Every structure is written in C-alpha cells, then in structure tokens.
C-alpha cells in the first residue's frame, strides 16, 4: 500500500536537497549520517506512484532514494543487510516501543535489541508482557515523556503482536493527487541518472566487497556461517583491557569505566552517571516517585535495590557472609561495617 508524502516529509527532503547543494558532493561523512539516511528511508517507503510522471520516473526516484538511504559507497553488504533487517524489526514493534527505540537512534539491529532489553530490565519484567496496570503505565509514561509526543494508549508488549501491514489492512488507500505537483517539482529540479546506471553502480560496489573464491557453494556457505557465528559471539573488543562483547552498545558502556566519561547528567542537581538507567533511578530522588511496592506490607521504594533489601526482612535472607567469622548480613553495607571490627583487631 502506497502513501503520499506528508508536507512535513516533503520539507525534510527539501532540507536534504538544500544541504547537498550547499556542502557539495565531497562531504561523504555528512551524507552517511544516520539522520539523513532515516529521512531518505522514509521518503523511499512513502513515495506514491501517482506522484511520478510515469513508471520510469517512479523507478528512477526510488533508486535514488534507496541509494541515498543505503549508501553502498559507505556500507558493506553485511551493513546494508543489517539496515534492511533493522527497518523491518522496527516496523513490527508496537507503536509505543517503536517510538522509544527510534528515539535512541540505533544503527544496527543489535543496538535496537539492546535498547529493548535495557527497557525490559528497567521495568523488571524481562521477556514478559508489561502489565497494563496504572503503576506500570506511569513508569513507561515517564520514559516516553522525553520524546515530546502524546501517548494516550500504553498497552505495550515487548514481543511482536501485529505487523504494520496487518494493522493497516482494510484501510482505504490515500490519494496522492494533492502532493503530486510538489513532488514533481522537487524531483525535476535534479538530474536523475537512468535506472540502469543506478543498478550497475550498486551492483559493482556490492560485488567489490565480496571476493570470489573457486570453492563449492556448500563449502562457502558453511565457512561463512561459521565465521559469522564466531564474529557474533565476541565481535567488539576493548582496546584497553582486551575484554570482548557481543554488542557495540555494551562495549561503549564498558569503555566509560576506562575514560571516566559520564554522559548522562541530572538537570536538577548536575550529578552525572555512566549509564542512562542510573540517571533514571536517580531522578526519582527529585520527583519522589516510588514505583516499587512490597507485596507483603505495601511499603513503596524508589529503586528496585531498596525493595530487594527490604524484602529480606520478611524472608529472613542474609546473603552477605563474613569470611572471618561466618556471620551473615542482610545488606552489604552492614557486612562492610562489621569487617572493620576484624581489621581493627588485627591492627592492635
């Protein structure tokens, strides 16, 4: 189903064209920026057949938009495949989760999954459907608030429910006549190369990334699968300590332990944090929000750690044990204070 370009979308593409004219053709890093690629992707998906003078012009426009989105001169075959998979993955997410993930600007499918896994951990319901009670809705509303959009319905699932095509099934097709004139003027301003030239250019660039080997198809597929699996296990390595990670986002967080970088800063008091989840927990100190409730006595807590420590009062659990005398404690701080007794005795 095709949809006509909205006025806001046309404005975004016009901005891109103006920037290209201003900066010239040698600014490849700017052209490969995630923001610009996302705008081209949106226009590639939303281009309506009625907006083009004819079938060849429509195909040419699609080739140009697709090339600007996937940037074969900047990306390998694997990276282009990842961009396509990332787009489809985002499209099958519920709208609330889709907006949440897009706000973090993931560049790969793995980064998108990491954003969702972080959200699962913060909601303390990993791998399960988030309950629709008011308490959970308030928590998620706080997380979605920075997006600056109204979210009236927050029945969120962390697993796929309906694809975008299923959600749009049965809806009448929109008429693109209103935007046809604007789009014709927009694309006629540029001299678009012929579609055959696009095809040859992209094929040449893609084939250049993968050398040909005189091996059988089965051997190549098996070797490629084995190398891919090994790369996926530990493909991101820290240059400082040699520790490896499966996801680039985990490596980025780890590097901050070496650099001391704390990019997440509290607007209220200025305190900085290494991870975004730590800042979210800290914000509750200022807002007074206590989303964690003890089922035994009903006491509320601002953080999950405080609730866990409190619940040990009811269960009698004392997981922290002194190595010197074997005495157990409910919280680690009590164990640390106790260990000073042994340290003082040794000194005297």
UniProtKB/Swiss-Prot annotation:
- Say yes or no: keyword Signal present: no
Q: Which UniProt key words apply to this protein?
A: DNA-binding, Metal-binding, Nucleus, Repeat, Transcription, Transcription regulation, Zinc, Zinc-finger
Molecular function GO terms recorded? DNA-binding transcription factor activity, RNA polymerase II-specific; RNA polymerase II cis-regulatory region sequence-specific DNA binding; sequence-specific double-stranded DNA binding; zinc ion binding
In which residue ranges is the amino acid composition biased (Basic and acidic residues)?
163-184
Q: Which GO terms describe its biological process?
A: regulation of transcription by RNA polymerase II
**Classification via InterPro entries:** SCAN_dom, SCAN_sf, Znf_C2H2_sf, Znf_C2H2_type
Where are the C2H2-type Zn fingers located? 236-258, 264-286, 292-314, 320-342
Q: Which Gene3D superfamilies match?
A: Classic Zinc Finger, DNA breaking-rejoining enzymes
Task: Tell me the impact of changing residue 137 to Q.
Answer: In a colorectal cancer sample; somatic mutation
Location comes to: Nucleus
Q: What is its main location?
A: nucleus
Residue ranges, annotated region (Disordered): 160-184, 205-226
Q: Tell me, in a sentence or two, what this protein's role is.
A: May be involved in transcriptional regulation.
Question: What is stated as this protein's family in its record?
Answer: Belongs to the krueppel C2H2-type zinc-finger protein family.
Q: What is this protein called?
A: Zinc finger and SCAN domain-containing protein 16
Organism annotation: Homo sapiens
Q: What is the lineage of its organism?
A: Eukaryota, Metazoa, Chordata, Craniata, Vertebrata
């Amino acid at each position: 189903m095709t949809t006509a370009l909205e006025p806001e979308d046309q404005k975004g593409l016009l901005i891109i064209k103006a920037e290209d004219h201003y900066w010239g053709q040698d600014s490849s890093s700017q052209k490969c920026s995630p923001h610009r690629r996302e705008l081209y992707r949106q226009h590639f998906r939303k281009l309506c057949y009625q907006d083009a003078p004819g079938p060849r012009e429509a195909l040419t426009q699609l080739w140009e938009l697709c090339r600007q989105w996937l940037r074969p001169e900047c990306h390998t075959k694997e990276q282009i495949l990842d961009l396509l998979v990332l787009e489809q993955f985002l499209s099958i997410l519920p709208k609330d989760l889709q907006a949440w993930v897009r706000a973090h600007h993931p560049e790969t499918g793995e980064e998108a999954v990491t954003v969702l896994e972080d959200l699962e951990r913060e909601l303390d319901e990993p791998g399960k459907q988030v309950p629709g009670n008011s308490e959970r809705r308030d928590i998620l509303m706080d997380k979605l608030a920075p997006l600056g959009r109204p979210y009236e319905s927050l029945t969120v699932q962390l697993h796929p429910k309906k694809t975008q095509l299923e959600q749009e099934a049965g809806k009448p097709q929109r008429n693109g006549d209103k935007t046809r004139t604007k789009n014709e003027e927009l694309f006629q301003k540029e001299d678009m190369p012929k579609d055959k030239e696009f095809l040859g250019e992209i094929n040449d660039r893609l084939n250049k990334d993968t050398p040909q080997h005189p091996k059988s198809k089965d051997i190549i597929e098996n070797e490629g699968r084995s190398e891919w699996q090994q790369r996926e296990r530990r493909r991101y390595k820290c240059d400082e300590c040699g520790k490896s990670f499966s996801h680039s986002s985990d490596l980025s967080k780890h590097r901050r332990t070496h650099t001391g970088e704390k990019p997440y800063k509290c607007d209220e008091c200025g305190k900085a944090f290494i991870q975004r989840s730590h800042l979210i927990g800290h914000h509750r100190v200022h807002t007074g929000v206590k989303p964690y409730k003890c089922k035994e006595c009903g006491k509320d807590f601002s953080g999950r750690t405080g609730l866990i420590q409190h619940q040990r009062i009811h269960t009698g659990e004392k997981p922290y044990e002194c190595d010197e005398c074997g005495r157990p404690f409910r919280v680690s701080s009590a164990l640390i204070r106790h260990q000073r007794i042994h340290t003082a005795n040794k000194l005297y």
